Amino acid sequence: MFKNKWFVGGFIVIITVTLYYSLSTELPFVERIERSREDYRQNILSMEDSPIDLDTFEHFEYFDPNESFLIEGKFTASKENETFKLMMTDSSTNDIPLAGTAELVIDGQTVKLKVFDEGETFLLPFNDKTNSIKTYGGGRYINIEKRAVNDDEITVDFNEAHNFYCAYNINYVCPLPPSENNIGIEIDAGERTYGDHQHD
């Protein structure tokens, strides 16, 4: 990754390591989540162009692991070569391949969320009712390994939700979750607000 961009480069290193634990079925649920978070911490802090200010960093804040936010749902693939114009925090747009739509039931509410194809993984950016209160105001994202999608089924673990780099450093340009991915309930899972950066 290089400064002022979000969709490129070294971020794949973090994805690869953390997703190893996120999809491991051999570890107990809580241990798997805790290991994944620790690997995320170690990798983002060791990045050559880390968005974290190492002089002031203390720790990341997370909700406690909650298996009720590990959700299996329906997946509808998009048409071949279909793209979506994703708005960025600097008012620019980024054309990104649209992988499809995930239909999930969360706390009794059915939501249909757009899922994007980043090459190595799928990307699910979202907003929810915790924004600017318990979590970063600009929304969060989940990276989903492609093997978590099986034909018309998808597994989404909101415990793996992380802040966009803009939550750590205003010098980064990040995607804004599309309006279709606004979830009308609180997702008390994944990463919480970082420091005082509640708004994008």
Residue ranges and their predicted role:
Residues N169-D200:
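C-terminal partner/receptor-binding element of secreted or periplasmic proteins
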Residues D128-H162:
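Acidic, glycine-rich flexible loop segments
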Residues K79-R140:
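Mid-length scaffold segments of soluble, non-membrane domains
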